[in-house]
Each structure stands twice: as C-alpha cells, then as structure tokens.
C-alpha cells in the first residue's frame, strides 16, 4: 500500500540523488559551505514559524546535508582521480562539473543516494541510532567507502616515510603528502581553534 511515509521516503531519495549530483558538480567544500548557509536559513524558518523542516529536510536532510552533497563531492573526486581526470583525490574543492564528464557526476548522485539510505538505516538501530551523530558517521563511512573502491586500499604503504620506525612517523606529513601546511603543528591550530571558539562563544 502506497502511504504518505513511502511518498516522503521516495521524495527524499530523489532529492538525495539530485543533491549528490549537485554536490559533485560544485565540489565537496563548496557544497559544505552551502550547507552552512542552509543552516542559517533553517534557523530563520524556525524563528519565524517554529518549524524544523529546514534542518531535517534541507540543511541536514536529503537536499544539502553533508552526508549527501559533501560526501558526493569527495566520492566524485576519488573516482575522477582513479580515471586520471584530476591529479589528486584529496581535491575536494575543485568543481567537478569542469571536467565535462557525466560519469563523475553520476558517481556523486549514487553516493548521494547511498548517504540518504545509510543515514536512515543508522537511525533505526536501537539505542545506537539515537545516541550518535548519524550524519557525521555517514559522511565518514561514505568517504571510507570511496577510498576503498577507488583508492589504493585504506592505507598507502608505498607512500610511507622511508626509514620511519613507528606508524605515526610513517604517516607523518612530508613535502609530497600533506593537507594544510599552516595547520599541522599544535602551535598553529590550537590558537586558531581557541580564538574561533571564543568568537563563537561571544556571539552566543
């Protein structure tokens, strides 16, 4: 029997497919930025009408949730690197629409659908689903899945620092493999985190 719950579920799935396609098209980081704006927009809806639909359906839902759009951008980048279309799968910033490849964006759409379904599945797990951030865990799981499918395994031993004796030294950033050089040391990221947290606390 076709019920309203089924209709809402299918509508969400369709939205997630489009959201994943869009997230891959504009790039994961830009998609995540839009999620932030959608959160502000959702607060406006809540303040005016008391409705949380903006949070549940848009900002953290199938439209612009990070488990949909950001995760899709990451998966699309991993696939594009595997196909030799971009240099690094870590590039979650560049819009993938610039590649002109439909298959890359369809990967994003597929991971958008995966994020939607996996997040719902987590929420139905007794106790566990109500005591964790299912959206964050879905993002993590989606990214690991993309790595396993299109990366060189979960880890890349061939890229370890040669001569290192401990695991942490083997995977330590070097001149070839790094994320943000200006945020690698505690003296760099701790003051930044403290000041950003203090600023947010002052506004609150």
Give residue ranges: language-model regions.
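Membrane-helix interface and helix-disruption motif detector
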Residues: 1-6, 50-62, 92, 117-136, ...
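N-terminal signal-anchor module of multipass membrane proteins
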Residues: 1-63
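Hydrophobic core segments of alpha-helical transmembrane domains in multi-pass membrane transport
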Residues: 15-21, 39-43, 71-78, 108-120, ...
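Membrane helical hairpin/interfacial module
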Residues: 35-39, 50-92
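Membrane-interface helix-loop-helix junctions at boundaries between adjacent transmembrane segments
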Residues: 85-165
